[in-house]
From Swiss-Prot:
Protein's UniProt name: 3-octaprenyl-4-hydroxybenzoate carboxy-lyase
Record note on cofactor: Binds 1 prenylated FMN per subunit.
Lineage, opening ranks: Bacteria, Pseudomonadati, Pseudomonadota, Gammaproteobacteria, Cellvibrionales
Source organism, top-level taxon: Bacteria
Organism: Saccharophagus degradans (strain 2-40 / ATCC 43961 / DSM 17024)
Location(s), subcellular: Cell membrane
Membrane topology value: Peripheral membrane protein
């Protein structure tokens, strides 16, 4: 499945009964959130609100509201197929040298495919069919959602922010929410370690006192959107990765007011700058934790120009207590993470981010334990290997006889294989999500690792328990006579 733009994806979803057009008048103030939330929790379709109160532009919501739709957006038939995407990323992250001529020939197509996926620069792009600039810029004309009753303002939730540092060979694509504070002003909420913030910091050092150019795409094609939230190796651009997912080069075009390249098929492009020293208080907003976050100061993005397609569609979402779209994305991307982790730690059998853990705050790992202390090595490896797990507060490691995705199994392992004093690892003063108000200091807190594996000699002085298992002979015998017993008869 290859989607040139968001509209291609919408058409396929509608064909498969996975998109619902809503003609009834719906308000972007709170109502779209409530409808989307109920639909997502029921495993329902993507929603295209065609009659948005106060606006002529339709709103697309709940696009990635099921793991299968995430997989479809990444060009795969189902969630299980995302393991193949993870295997490709694992190879690209740490490619192994060929073991011989035959191996070299087998790997050659992969390298050629990657090299051939550099974005394609085009002119006369659909995203630039129409333009408003200067005094005519009016962000309030876009049906930006106000998601929750306590939110400070309307919030842009699916912006693909394009930046480039002065010393970087390639652009950074990141998704950072943006609060509307004026007809041409948005607050850019990027945390200090994120790519956009790092680019901005380098720019200020290289060009003190100068405005930092920024472009933002709204409503890009699904592969490009999902490429921006996937752990792409530093050697591969998000545009190139989107091309690999799509099977064709990502078409980009040069912004009209700066040199940044933006997705050519996006519904909207916002062009502008961040002026040095221009900051504003952002929030509070309801977030993926299920709570309102604290107010904090972030840079202001001044929009100088808006270009858009004919009859544009505004792509939006909300975040709230799981399940929400970020949690669903986490479930799907979980399958991408597994091969990447297993390449670094072959002893890992499965890795699971429970969606109720706010996408990434808790991880469960099952492994083939090989020596005393092995579980601790794995938990420390999870925290340090991918930047996506830097904010994971709890890591539970257990044996491969436990199903990481079954809480009955996990709780059994925790309560039977763990001594809290011996098997708990606490790490203080580590990076924590700024939205985590439970930490004593904003952005800095502790982590807990729990070793729920069977203990080896050296880890305990006691005789370890043996699990109870029925013999295969008896199981087979009962299977053969089960229907005759009449137990399942109603």
């Amino acid at each position: 499945m290859a989607f040139k733009d968001l509209r291609d994806f919408i058409a396929l979803l509608e064909e498969k009964g996975q998109l619902k057009r809503i003609s009834h008048p719906v308000d972007p103030y709170l109502e779209i959130t409530e409808i989307s939330d109920r639909t997502l929790r029921a495993g329902g379709p993507a929603l295209l609100f065609e009659n948005v109160v106060g606006h002529t532009t339709p709103v697309l919501a709940n696009l990635f509201g099921t793991p299968d739709r995430v997989a479809m957006g990444m060009g795969q038939e189902n969630v299980g197929a995302l393991r193949e995407v993870g295997e490709l990323l694992a190879f690209l992250k740490e490619p192994e040298p060929p073991k011989g001529m035959k191996d070299a020939w087998e790997k050659l197509p992969i390298f050629k495919q990657v090299l051939n996926m550099a974005p394609k620069l085009i002119k006369n792009a659909p995203c630039q069919e129409f333009e408003v600039s200067g005094e005519d810029v009016d962000l309030t004309a876009i049906p930006i959602q106000t998601c929750w009753p306590g939110d400070a303002a309307p919030l842009v939730t699916w912006p693909l922010v394009v930046t480039k540092g002065p010393h970087k060979d390639r652009q950074n694509l990141g998704i950072y929410r943006m609060q509307l504070i004026g007809k041409n002003k948005l607050i850019m909420r990027w945390l200090s370690h994120r790519g956009g913030a790092l680019d901005f910091r380098e720019w200020q050092q290289q060009h003190p006192g100068e405005n930092f150019p920024v472009s933002v795409a709204l409503g890009a094609d699904p592969a490009t959107i999902l490429g921006a939230v996937t752990p792409v190796p530093d050697t591969l651009s998000e545009y190139a990765f989107a091309g690999l997912l799509r099977g064709s080069k990502t078409e980009v075009t040069k912004s009209r007011g700066n040199d940044l390249q933006v997705p050519a098929s996006a519904e909207y492009i916002l062009e502008g700058h961040i002026a040095p020293g221009e900051m504003a208080d952002e929030g509070p907003f309801g977030d993926h934790t299920g709570y309102y976050n604290e107010v904090d100061s972030f840079p202001v993005f001044t929009v100088e120009r808006i270009t858009h397609r004919k009859d544009p569609i505004y792509h939006s979402t909300y975040t709230g207590r799981p399940p929400d779209e970020p949690a669903v994305l986490g479930v799907a991307l979980n399958e991408v993470f597994v091969p990447i982790l297993k390449k670094q730690f072959p002893e890992i059998v499965d890795f699971y981010l429970p969606p109720e853990g706010c996408s990434y705050r808790m991880a469960v790992v099952t492994m083939k334990k090989q020596y005393p202390g092995h579980a601790k090595r794995v938990m420390l490896g999870v925290w340090s290997f991918l930047r996506q797990f830097m904010y994971t507060k709890f890591v539970i490691v257990t044996d491969d006889d436990v199903n990481a995705r079954d809480w009955n199994d996990v709780i059994w392992a925790l309560t039977t294989r763990v001594d809290p004093m011996r098997d708990t690892t606490m790490i203080d003063n580590t990076p924590i999500d700024y939205l985590d108000f439970a930490s004593p200091v904003s952005g800095l807190g502790s982590k807990m690792g729990i070793d729920a594996t069977n203990k080896w000699p050296g880890e305990t002085n006691r005789e370890w328990g043996t699990t109870i298992e029925m013999t295969a002979e008896v199981k087979n015998k009962v299977d053969a006579i089960w229907d005759k017993l009449g137990i399942d008869d109603k």
